[in-house]
């Protein structure tokens, strides 16, 4: 016992002496090695600032090691470092680590104090923040969290309780649960899809193995469907999932199989199937893509699906279709220079010259590809060379 204590004291003394000697780059490198090896005694000795430009790093490594062991956390030391390095990447990173630990342990009081100082919270921390608000009885938290149901594909563990609460409080319908299952299966997030499917009403929950079969061998699954598959919601949904997955590898084969069973689906279900098939066809530059998109009607689509719908309409020379597709995009996508330009072209082709000019004016006047094209539509042309006075 005495020997082990002496050995520990000797190790600490050695680390202190080494830290005093290595006040330059060597100290920083030694601190990095101590952090990697988990040598907390050496790391503590190297953490004190010594006038080096990289001093925040050893201190960060030391505090990060504390955050990993809740019993060792010194909130005052953490806050002092965070305040001293406010706005720096290391401070943001350390605060995020601290908040994750607080969230995992359900220490919502401290979490609520520290979270507002985070400048760019990642998705898992946003979900911990929703958990904190729910724990504190914030009645607006679920309403603000509801968009996660529709937008979240890669689902951090901290978001699962929030999604579960949306289901428990009946803030998402069975149709919306199925829509999430579809989207997760489209993105090949099968595990999360199975989890979401488990939240369906009992009479609609599919067997997890059926979801896997529909995704793993979609052609075989569709070819072996029983005649009465469409009698239940799960039967139709699994067929739709298989069609969407098959369309990725054999788009025409998916459409042929869809035609055999299209009357078994509701109008909304037919729109979904055709939207998936058209999306894959457009990416393969198949001439049928535009026709299939039109047949899909106004079925809800992801941003990527809508963008390919506009491209398919462009390839088909359907300016009305181009306009309707771009106008259906969210503003963040529709206002990007490429889509603003093509919307302007569509408006011009459809006789809406004033609307076209306004769009070209919005994006013109910059040394960028679509800006130059917009200037040409406005009759300005493009002048090469360095602007006068730039080199003065």
Positions of PLM-derived features:
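Extracytoplasmic and endomembrane cell-envelope/extracellular-matrix remodeling and assembly machinery
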Residues: 21-392
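Bacterial N-terminal signal peptides that target proteins for export
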Residues: 1-9
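Hydrophobic h-region of N-terminal signal peptides that target proteins for export
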Residues: 11-21
């Amino acid at each position: 016992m005495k020997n082990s204590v002496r050995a520990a004291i000797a190790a600490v003394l050695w680390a202190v002496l080494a830290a005093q000697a290595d006040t330059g780059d060597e100290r920083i490198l030694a601190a990095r090695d101590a952090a990697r090896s988990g040598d907390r005694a050496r790391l503590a000795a190297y953490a004190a600032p010594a006038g080096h430009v990289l001093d925040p790093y050893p201190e960060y490594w030391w505090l990060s090691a504390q955050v990993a062991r809740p019993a060792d956390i010194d909130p005052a030391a953490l806050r002092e470092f965070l305040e001293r390095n406010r706005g720096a990447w290391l401070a943001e990173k350390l605060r995020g680590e601290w908040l994750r630990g607080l969230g995992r342990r359900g220490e919502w009081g401290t979490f609520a104090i520290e979270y507002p100082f985070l400048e760019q919270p990642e998705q898992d921390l946003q979900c911990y923040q929703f958990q904190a608000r729910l724990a504190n009885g914030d009645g607006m938290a679920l309403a603000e969290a509801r968009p996660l149901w529709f937008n979240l594909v890669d689902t951090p563990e901290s978001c699962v309780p929030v999604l579960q609460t949306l289901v428990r409080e009946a803030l998402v319908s069975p149709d919306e649960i199925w829509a999430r299952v579809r989207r997760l299966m489209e993105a090949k997030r099968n595990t999360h899809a199975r989890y979401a499917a488990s939240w369906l009403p009992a009479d609609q929950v599919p067997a997890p193995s059926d979801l896997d079969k529909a995704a793993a061998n979609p052609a075989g699954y569709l070819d072996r469907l029983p005649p009465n598959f469409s009698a239940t919601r799960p039967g139709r949904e699994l067929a739709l999932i298989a069609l969407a997955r098959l369309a990725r590898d054999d788009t025409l084969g998916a459409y042929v199989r869809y035609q055999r069973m299209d009357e078994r689906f509701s109008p909304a279900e037919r729109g979904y199937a055709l939207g998936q098939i058209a999306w894959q066809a457009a990416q393969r530059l198949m001439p049928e893509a535009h026709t299939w998109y039109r047949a899909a009607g106004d079925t809800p689509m992801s941003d990527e699906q809508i963008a390919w719908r506009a491209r398919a309409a462009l390839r088909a020379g359907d300016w009305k279709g181009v306009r309707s597709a771009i106008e259906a995009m969210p503003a963040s996508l529709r206002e990007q220079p490429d889509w603003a330009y093509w919307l302007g072209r569509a408006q011009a082709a459809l006789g809406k010259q004033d609307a076209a000019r306004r769009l070209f004016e919005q994006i013109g006047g910059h040394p960028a590809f679509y800006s130059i094209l917009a200037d040409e539509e406005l009759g300005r042309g493009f002048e090469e060379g360095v602007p006068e006075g730039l080199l003065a």
